[in-house]
């Protein structure tokens, strides 16, 4: 099966939290099981540095890093990689399924839109980012109304990390 993983940051950018580690571990395991795994991510390493390797293969996973507009924004969970969106539009139809890590991101909107356009099933894994109870509540509510509710509605599956997260859906 050809699987595309979409995540804002990927190893060695471990400072960006759980989605980095989970997407990496899931990708490694899928590759070990014989699946063709590709990861689309940004070039963010941390708030000051970028990973200057646009394409690489690690542990059976093809990793493509797209330039994000600002590492400072990425450090605030606002990574934006326009070239990734353009590439998704062109090639998402080559995949059997898309696994999207994170919920409120530019990459998520693009991946969901193009997967839906080409009738490619997508799995959405918010990694605990669904609740609006923490900072930026107003912005999160706007995102949810404009994009988020549709992203959830059209997902083939949604992965929750806890019983509490299940209740948020």
Q: How should each PLM-predicted stretch be described?
A:
Residues 1-52, 59-62, 93, 153:
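N-terminal subdomain of nucleotide-sugar transferases
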Residues 121-123, 131-154:
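Nucleotide-sugar donor phosphate/pyrophosphate-binding loop at the beta->alpha transition
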Residues 6, 40-42, 66, 125, ...:
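Generic beta-sheet signal
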Residues 90-96:
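Glycine-rich phosphate-binding loop signature in dinucleotide/nucleotide-binding domains
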